[in-house]
Amino acid sequence: MGQLIFNQPSEDKSALEDAGDFTPRFDDRGLITAVVADAGDGELLMVAHMNAQALALTIQTGTAHYFSRSRGKIWKKGETSGNLQTVKEIRTDCDQDAIWLKVEVAGHDATCHTGRRSCFYRTVTLREGKPMLDIVDDERHFDPQDVYGK
């Protein structure tokens, strides 16, 4: 499998919006935002970032790869936990600066490193003038200590 190269995005807005060429617009750090949802029920699972190499690997292999800003490297989602994400569909937004992955999650059907299905397991509420977090999905599909040793 050869290296997948993305062409530079067009300056022509209509070309970005209506043409058939996928020319992702990476930010000044070389990243694009990836919104990830379950292919079956549409639940929002996570938001991550990809560089060109992670996006190319995802397209070529059908398995989600992301770029870790904190570790400064690419990771295959679920490689340690067994919760690999098989990509069923990739969409891009109108100006091609974000992508939306629809995935099936293997293993424990959990995406979050906390063991939960989704990274979005809390709501933000206002109590006594202070923003607070409330857990709305506390079901853990695996124990992070067992999987990651943390």
From Swiss-Prot:
Zn(2+) binds at residues 94, 112, 119. It comes from the Bacteria. It catalyses: 1-(5-phospho-beta-D-ribosyl)-5'-AMP + H2O = 1-(5-phospho-beta-D-ribosyl)-5-[(5-phospho-beta-D-ribosylamino)methylideneamino]imidazole-4-carboxamide. One of its GO terms (biological process) is L-histidine biosynthetic process. Pathway: Amino-acid biosynthesis; L-histidine biosynthesis; L-histidine from 5-phospho-alpha-D-ribose 1-diphosphate: step 3/9. Signal peptide: none annotated. Homodimer. This is Phosphoribosyl-AMP cyclohydrolase. It comes from Rhizobium etli (strain ATCC 51251 / DSM 11541 / JCM 21823 / NBRC 15573 / CFN 42).
